[in-house]
UniProtKB/Swiss-Prot annotation:
Record's protein name: Leukemia inhibitory factor receptor
Topological domain ranges for the Extracellular compartment: 45-833
Modified residues (Phosphoserine): 927, 1044
Species: Homo sapiens (Human)
Short sequence motif WSXWS motif: positions: 519-523
Cross-referenced SMART domains: FN3
Quaternary organization: Heterodimer composed of LIFR and IL6ST. The heterodimer formed by LIFR and IL6ST interacts with the complex formed by CNTF and CNTFR.
Similarity comment text for this entry: Belongs to the type I cytokine receptor family. Type 2 subfamily.
Amino acid sequence: MMDIYVCLKRPSWMVDNKRMRTASNFQWLLSTFILLYLMNQVNSQKKGAPHDLKCVTNNLQVWNCSWKAPSGTGRGTDYEVCIENRSRSCYQLEKTSIKIPALSHGDYEITINSLHDFGSSTSKFTLNEQNVSLIPDTPEILNLSADFSTSTLYLKWNDRGSVFPHRSNVIWEIKVLRKESMELVKLVTHNTTLNGKDTLHHWSWASDMPLECAIHFVEIRCYIDNLHFSGLEEWSDWSPVKNISWIPDSQTKVFPQDKVILVGSDITFCCVSQEKVLSALIGHTNCPLIHLDGENVAIKIRNISVSASSGTNVVFTTEDNIFGTVIFAGYPPDTPQQLNCETHDLKEIICSWNPGRVTALVGPRATSYTLVESFSGKYVRLKRAEAPTNESYQLLFQMLPNQEIYNFTLNAHNPLGRSQSTILVNITEKVYPHTPTSFKVKDINSTAVKLSWHLPGNFAKINFLCEIEIKKSNSVQEQRNVTIKGVENSSYLVALDKLNPYTLYTFRIRCSTETFWKWSKWSNKKQHLTTEASPSKGPDTWREWSSDGKNLIIYWKPLPINEANGKILSYNVSCSSDEETQSLSEIPDPQHKAEIRLDKNDYIISVVAKNSVGSSPPSKIASMEIPNDDLKIEQVVGMGKGILLTWHYDPNMTCDYVIKWCNSSRSEPCLMDWRKVPSNSTETVIESDEFRPGIRYNFFLYGCRNQGYQLLRSMIGYIEELAPIVAPNFTVEDTSADSILVKWEDIPVEELRGFLRGYLFYFGKGERDTSKMRVLESGRSDIKVKNITDISQKTLRIADLQGKTSYHLVLRAYTDGGVGPEKSMYVVTKENSVGLIIAILIPVAVAVIVGVVTSILCYRKREWIKETFYPDIPNPENCKALQFQKSVCEGSSALKTLEMNPCTPNNVEVLETRSAFPKIEDTEIISPVAERPEDRSDAEPENHVVVSYCPPIIEEEIPNPAADEAGGTAQVIYIDVQSMYQPQAKPEEEQENDPVGGAGYKPQMHLPINSTVEDIAAEEDLDKTAGYRPQANVNTWNLVSPDSPRSIDSNSEIVSFGSPCSINSRQFLIPPKDEDSPKSNGGGWSFTNFFQNKPND
């Protein structure tokens, strides 16, 4: 090899030198190089040399070195291998490998000389342990087996550790393959140690898939880690493959069968079938299929839940068949809890425990228990179905002679696992006795009895502590503890004393050991009545004098059971004085009263109770009662069920105090009960089952002296006050316009139910059928309340009321226990007559005063009133007849009323008063209203009669009245006032003397009708009396024109005359100015006369 290296280096050196010298001729150099290389190759093929030396070891003792032969050599090549070490050694070989002993640390020169037909060649190598590889021999599987029930593979092989000089660590790599396609399922490592000898190794693996489902393959290899070897360490080759396959031997097609697994685990089921599987179910759930070899399939279940007690079905369905199995998912046994061992009779030990969590496995898969006693090595087993939750298990273990301490171990096992619990006990301290039986009671005397019972077991070595329960009727139970020594025959006896004679007792008993572990259960109850004895005390006595004071009544109370000591048959009553002793015949029970006729001497009364055994000591009481003049009745109130009575200490009281009480409604002598209190006491609480709330009781406190009893205090009271049950009965005694006097009666004591504290009187306005006063305590401002705290007051006057008003009155009584019901009444106050008179007089007086003042004012202002409201000359502007519509008057030229146009009246109608002048016979004043036909009045109710007025022109004579009428005539409203203002007729004498004195209204002229020429004097008189003067000469007027409507048509509604007139008055529109003109004497009444001034007024 070194020669080859030299040969290769030489041409390179020559080429390099030639290149340096002849760099100019590149082509020539290249050709020369190729030629020399080819020559060198041919030369090398001819000579050759060994190369690629490689050394390995598989046991660290021998190195197996090999190299590659020179090229072109054949089988006839020999090799000489020389190793340069402390002593040169050479080996002649005909092959390319050599086994040499392992060399120590350091570098070694290896020379390999090859001898062949072409010659020889030599190669030198440097060999060191670091260039050596440690490759273990290929391992061999000795055995591969399977447990198909558990789907477990078991592997066995030999590590050949005897060939290794040193202790080494070995890593084994195990590969598990599945199916014919050899899919990798598991690759694990297994560590062992080489210890200088051949060792068999075992490895097992539980498949997640039943081994029946598919073929499984296993192969292994190893890796040796030696601390003393510095070379390269490599894996060995894989061992030959071993396989496991299932050979069908039954009709079973689904695996695994009846598998028990842990809840929450994953499991694979498979179906080995020649038919195609269509579906798979676990319970009611479909599962996806996993295809294996052929038609075999599998399903994977993850995190399986707890199954029912009968298991969970797994079903595979093919076209023609159904195959299946059952799976049981549960838990391993829990550690036994509350393990306890005790004994009832020191013959058997009972160990009990709580199994803890339910495993959900029953039947053959249920948990089995084994109780092992380690000192003796004995054990007992329990195998049973799974217990319900919280149920305790028990195992009986027979006690061993002369052994008191036991060490128990309780083992629990089921297909999923194991658990255990231990306990160490001294059994004599863990005794839980049986329930005592055959419990009996027998009399010893009236105050002692004997108890006997049976307790199974041999307790001769221990002592018992027994508790006896003693209970009397209506009394607190009593416990007594007794210690007794244990016996072998199980019969026990004990005596009880300090009992009461003639008393019904109830007994029961339970026992425990003196060291105490547990009480036994109580025995059955046993009732027993003790025997009688003489009464231990005399009866409690009291006496009362009869109402006539001649007989003394003696009372006594029945003796309580604890003092009677038996059934009382009779009583002996006797009375004695300094002079004599008097005894009564025996008084049979249950009579507790006797009456003796005594005089006023002092006697001592004795009462003795007797039963079948003997008599009681006598009870004595004095008959004399010491008077007490300074005695007041007091009030007391109880507190709940009793009443507290107190008094001052009195050293004169030598014996005791007696408190007597009774219902106050009972007749004399009053006695319900009594109580005696020691003489050094100053208070007591009286309680009785007969006390009732709201009932008044009388209490009497007596003090005892040698010579008799003295009444110290007299009290009335209630155990509890209540509100009255009835309302006070009240009436109205008197009623006035502003007050009401009411009076009420006392409430009976039985209905009062407490001490009366006052009355509440409500009053307010209200009617009988209204609800205004229904709620009395609502705080209404219109309801007044009077609180009457003086209970002696029986009347009340309510003042400041309104007259003729209805009032609602309510009266209620109250105690400290509450307010009683109400009694109501409605009362109406009387009417106030003074007020009525005043109410009438005041308006009348006001009216009179107003009238007088008005009259005085009117009289003083009569001139102003006349001028203002009714002047002598009315203002035409105020005349209603002249108030025309402005628009009509201004907008029409046909209206010519009061216009100064020349016209000649056709006819004049004169309205005048009666006078001395002759009347015009053929001239009449026509009232248009009166003469209007009824049908026209209905058709035109608002039409007015219009008369024409036109002041004549003196200078001009109108020849043609018709033309004037045709030209238009002014019209004036005319009203007939003749009947309204007709004056009273005067005697003819007065008429002759004053022909015009009664005229009220005068027309513009007054002309005689019969003669056109009158006496001048008469004419002057007429002029003087006339109230209105026409503006023109009256002599020129035509009174009646031949062409007037009146002369033409007597039924015409149009009446015309020359002078205007007022339609609302009969006075002259223009009165005379001279003072000498005669004045109207008021021949007729008119409104103006009311305002005329009288000169004599």
